[in-house]
């Protein structure tokens, strides 16, 4: 995906290659509470691990920065990857967590997947202790599709209507 996806006047998805927000992202991924929700371990990222993660995500899907407009400026607040095999989403800036922004992003990506004619979307793993994320995905119709060591996999069947 090579274009900006405008969700509303204050929220957008910026293709990863259009900006370098890795310095800000590193601060998110050094928060051990956030990393535990993402990776299941309380081990902060270093620059090398962050770069490896983004390199992997960029090769396996459409990687975006989640940006929020505040006082006329677009600020990076998280990242998300649209892939048929996984939908990792992180609102990394704590000031923007638990405000429904992840729901808006997820809704937009589900619509985009439908427009592309995809038949399903998968979430490889949500840890059992990540109740907020699981509730968010389930609210859009994702259902459990398997068990993992620390959680569950989810699946959403899409129709093109």
Model-derived features: where do they sit?
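A short, well-structured alpha-helix characteristic of acyl/acetyltransferase catalytic modules
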Residues: 1-51, 161
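Active-site rim helix/loop that mediates acceptor-substrate recognition in acyltransferases
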Residues: 42-61, 70
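Conserved beta-hairpin
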Residues: 62-77
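A short, internal acetyl-CoA/4′-phosphopantetheine-binding micro-motif in the GNAT/acyltransferase core
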Residues: 67, 86-101, 126-127
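C-terminal "cap" of GNAT-fold acetyltransferases
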Residues: 147-161
